[in-house]
Amino acid sequence: MLRPMTILRWVLAVGLLGSTACKRQPVSPFCPKGMREAPTWSDAGKSVWCEAPDKSRAQWIEWHPGTTKPRQSCAFHDGRSEGSFAAWHPGGKLWVQGQFAAGVKVGKWKQWDADGNEVAEGDYQTGRLVAGAPVAGMALCEKVARP
């Protein structure tokens, strides 16, 4: 499991490195290397949908309204949530962190309050809580998938 600051650094690095990834095609500064923004699925100033040329992989990043602070970020593979998920409080501190596999929560998920205190930790297998406490349902990535 990645540490909270590691994910935040990754999201910021994607923004800094993405702009140099491809010079011949329009690339959002928030898209990972090898992906480009899909304007139809992005919402200017609110979120960005990045996808691989073959559309098999995608990354979605949403910002808190009226700010440049990330609200949540997740990756997709073949239309399902796959990989790291992170959500942040409006003040910028990590709120929820976990992993998706085949569109469902797996492994250790954690939740923090706005002051950075851990308030819940749960272990998930195929989307079901098997140990610990349930983690917030902020994970819109469970619902967001390109048709």
Model region roles, listed by residue range:
Residues 9-19:
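Bacterial N-terminal signal peptides
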Residues 1-6:
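N-terminal secretory signal peptides that target proteins for export/translocation
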Residues 20-147:
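Glycine/tyrosine- and acidic-biased, solvent-exposed loop/turn segments at the edges of beta-strands
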